[in-house]
């Protein structure tokens, strides 16, 4: 009998604030955890043990650095002047984990009144990188909002309560062949662009499936 393929969940923890309960619950006990800079502080506070620390390390605490050295985490340090964000570097590192099946990004939202919308948008856009299609599932929980990325060749099953809201957004460019089954408002071979809101506020059914033929579709679950 052939050996069953391992399905590794790789979790990327970013900084910004404490992780929500929804984010923490999405992380499996056997997950491989990668921290992006000060994401290590949030990961440790949530009871995780990061195996890798990635970034320019300009925002991680001194205690976080000491934790990484004491626990012999792999440290991939980059110069502050770089073209990629720490989040992008961490996502790229996630794809190098053997048998990666799901990439899950988790992050909190700092309640300081100085939230960086540009950072949040850049993080969501990074999740749609074509290379991430190598993982079968790409998801995120940012604050208390869940995201799922739908790449061509993969479909996403939304495990939601009936009538729970979800939205479809073409944030990464036009999407064609958008098909949604089991929802209140199904779609068949539809096209969505980033300038229309036709996919906002749909309602899940008993089993809701989402797929796309071309483009990268973002499913938002408030």
Where are these regions (language model features)?
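Short N-terminal binding/cap micro-motifs at the start of the first secondary-structure element
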Residues: 20-23, 42
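N-terminal nucleotide-binding beta1-loop-alpha1 segment
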Residues: 1-18
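Active-site glycine-rich loop that binds ribose-phosphate moieties when present
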Residues: 19-20, 86-89, 151-152, 193-195
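Solvent-exposed alpha-helices and their adjacent loops that cap or buttress functional pockets
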Residues: 2-7, 24-28, 45-46, 67-69, ...
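Long, charged alpha-helical interface segments
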Residues: 143-145, 150-222
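Conserved phosphate- and dinucleotide-binding cores of soluble alpha/beta proteins
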Residues: 102, 110-162, 181, 189
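Short beta-strand segments
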Residues: 13-15, 37, 106-108, 141-142, ...
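Acidic/Gly/His-enriched mid-domain segments of enzyme catalytic cores or analogous surface patches
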Residues: 3-5, 27-30, 34, 38-135
């Amino acid at each position: 009998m052939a050996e069953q393929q391992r399905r590794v969940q790789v979790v990327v923890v970013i900084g910004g604030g404490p992780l929500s309960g929804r984010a923490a619950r999405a992380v499996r006990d056997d997950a491989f955890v990668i921290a992006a800079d000060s994401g290590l502080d949030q990961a440790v506070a949530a009871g995780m043990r990061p195996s890798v620390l990635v970034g320019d390390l300009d925002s991680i605490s001194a205690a976080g650095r000491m934790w990484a050295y004491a626990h012999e985490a792999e440290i991939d340090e980059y110069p502050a002047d770089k073209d990629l964000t720490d989040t992008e570097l961490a996502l790229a590192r996630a794809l190098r984990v053997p048998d990666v099946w799901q990439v899950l990004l988790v992050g909190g939202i700092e309640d300081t009144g100085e939230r960086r919308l540009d950072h949040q948008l850049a993080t969501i856009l990074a999740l749609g990188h074509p290379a991430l299609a190598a993982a079968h599932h790409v998801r995120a929980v940012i604050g208390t909002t869940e995201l799922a990325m739908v790449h061509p060749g993969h479909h996403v099953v939304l495990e939601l309560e009936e009538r729970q809201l979800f939205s479809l957004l073409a944030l990464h460019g036009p999407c064609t062949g958008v098909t949604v089954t089991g929802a209140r408002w199904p779609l068949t071979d539809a096209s969505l662009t980033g300038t229309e809101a036709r996919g906002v506020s749909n309602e899940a059914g008993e089993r809701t499936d989402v797929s796309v033929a071309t483009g990268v579709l973002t499913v938002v679950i408030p």
